[in-house]
Amino acid sequence: MKGTSEISSWISANCHRLSGDKQVCSEEIAIIAGGSRVRHIPPLVSALLIPDMPVAVWWVGDLPNEEQAYVETLLDPADRLIVDSSHFDRVEDLIWLHQIAERTFTAPADLNWVKLEDWRLVTAALFDAPSMRERLHDIRTLNITAIGGTQSLFGDSIESLYYAAWMIAQTGSDEIDNTFFIEPGDDTGAIMQVKIGFSGGFEVVIARDVAKGIVTATVGGKTQTLDCVARILGRSTEDLIVR
């Protein structure tokens, strides 16, 4: 482990006022370690945990593949691991996430998948119409354009990768060609446009207009505004965490 070999901690109370005079309070214990001292973190955390309470580990940033044994020791008492795969820099991070789910009792949860929920809802709503549902198995191409705001091209591509995998799972087809485009911008990995190509040349384009705060779908050359809006509020990672 890199960094200065030191360890420090502090405790603070956080209170949230509810209706009336009631409030919900919690204690937050922060431990910061560097260098060789990080080895002391797992036993310290275990000693501070309240028995029979659910435990979640929120890992901020990229997963340290070179320290798998250490991370899995830290996850030993955890029920859930929360990550944001937009910070991942290589495919091995996703493979390791799968291995954690397979060989430990900790269930991984990816905020990047949660951020994709609105796009999945929009797409599913589009195929609610019987005429579109009949075309579901005729999908041949997916062209996905996303915004890249990090140094990791792989991390910026994961939301698009998740969307493509989800679409392929819905169709049950392995004959869909996928193309990902990354454009520079501030909204890390956020999908901006999806082009769905069908056999026979039919095409559907789903796009979000951040300036207008709308999502449109162009089906067979006709454009409509969708009621279900995909990420126009710009939900950040902080918005997805319940404290």
What are these regions (language model features)?
Residues 9-15, 149, 161-243:
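C-terminal structured domains
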Residues 14-18, 80-83, 100-107, 111, ...:
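Acidic, Ser/Thr-rich peripheral helices and adjacent loops at domain boundaries
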Residues 52-133:
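Contiguous mid-protein beta-loop-alpha structural module that forms a pocket-lining wall or clamp
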Residues 112-179:
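ATP/pyrophosphate-binding catalytic subdomain of soluble kinases
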